[in-house]
Amino acid sequence: MKKILIPVSIIAILLCASWKEDAKTVSPDRLFLADSGKSLFVTNRAGNELIKMSSDGQKAEQKVTLSSPVNAMTQDPSGNLWVVCDGNTGMMYELDGKKLSVQSKTKSGATPSDILYSPVSKSLWVTQRFNNELWEIDPATRKVKTKIAIGREPVAMAPFAGDSCLLIANNLPEMPSTAYPIAVQLDIVDVPSKKVTGRIMLPNGATDAKSV
């Protein structure tokens, strides 16, 4: 049997081409992992959808349509998914991790940009991009427990130091736009004390933070 070798670059082109065929209905925007990396989710921004992909990434297995485009997703220890959606009246959804059925829907500020479940505080943390705040939310009641003032336009966060701290990327510094000596700043939030304990200023030119 004669072997046919296909360069990796061609495979990549074929994959992109197959995805492009669905571009009329799917606008892939963000990727999320759940179930310890065993489940892959992709957002369809144009359709306000969260889609669970097959293990090979070739087809959609399940999907749910939400109020507006999905900005971020996290998973709690029980397996439920928590999703925040874009918009001035942003929404936070609680989804069944297996069926993707909506368990709850809660208004969540002005453009919630990221969400994270903390095993330290056993609560949800949500960055509010146009409120310039970090909210702590009780997942049982879905009520805001704490509001922390942070930098302008927080867009993303990540845990570190054994989940005891959050590193938050802010799109703009805390000063008028006419006086920017720097561009992006990072805030360090201590989860147990619920306080901003540090700030890292990035040099001018480090603009438009998207992720951390």
Residue spans for each PLM region:
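Positively charged n-region of N-terminal signal peptides that target proteins for export
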Residues: 1-4
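Hydrophobic helical h-region of N-terminal Sec-dependent signal peptides
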Residues: 6-14
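Predominantly soluble domains enriched in secretory-pathway, periplasmic, or organellar proteins
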Residues: 13-212
